């Protein structure tokens, strides 16, 4: 059966990185496909016996974007195995990436008036407006603080999972970097004892045994994990019945290194029976340097 992955989202958020990863994974990839050709291309891929296809669609054909949600719905209704991933990033990060790459935003010419070149921020704002209907319907990955290597790993984990009633993701993050925009539920664990103030534990992470042992020694830590797990076990069935395909549970502490990482790892153990289950750590850990 043909599997289709559609990559879309804000320009500068990492669509090219995601598409290259899928190409390396054996997907037949096409970039910047106009929406009007999407159904025809997928039908041709099916007739040619292809098994995996990845397509990137961006804002360069803005007049057609309004049709994309309807096209996706129609293709799914016809039995197409279609997974849509929407990549996003905060405006500050996008502006920084454009500055580093020295590339023009694809909407620059569209917004030019009387020889006046629009600002990058104006282009980003218009693009957000154009893509908002699609963003609200699909799985969103906020790439603001992800390295290219982390994004490749996240996309790989996501597409390798068969389409389930609900993909459950636990992710840790640092409040000092902001709450990730892809989070459906956010739990603040900054009230828990902080290993950062123990000099021997400071360079470690919540995945290291000394930190895990230290945190497990506090009753309040176990109570926090029990309460979060209890909430999820009570309400996961309801989220599933709501035809939701993804649920991202974000756990945050100050630096995203100790407490949130530990809590995420413990929750992953408690929900190990849920398939598929994804675990993400937004703060770059020592073995995530690529």
From Swiss-Prot:
Residues that bind ATP: 9-16
InterPro entries recorded: P-loop_NTPase (IPR027417), RapZ-like (IPR005337), RapZ-like_N (IPR053930), RapZ_C (IPR053931)
Pfam families to which the protein is assigned, alphabetical: PapZ_C, RapZ-like_N
Domain of life: Bacteria
Keywords assigned: ATP-binding, GTP-binding, Nucleotide-binding
GO molecular function (one): GTP binding
Residue numbers binding GTP: 58-61
Function: Displays ATPase and GTPase activities.
PANTHER family with a match to the protein in the record: RNASE ADAPTER PROTEIN RAPZ (PTHR30448:SF0)
NCBIfam families for this protein: PRK05416.1 (NF003828)
HAMAP family (UniProt xref): RapZ_like
Family: Belongs to the RapZ-like family.
Annotated protein name in UniProt: Nucleotide-binding protein Bpet0443
Source organism: Bordetella petrii (strain ATCC BAA-461 / DSM 12804 / CCUG 43448)
The organism's taxonomic lineage, starting at the top: Bacteria, Pseudomonadati, Pseudomonadota, Betaproteobacteria, Burkholderiales
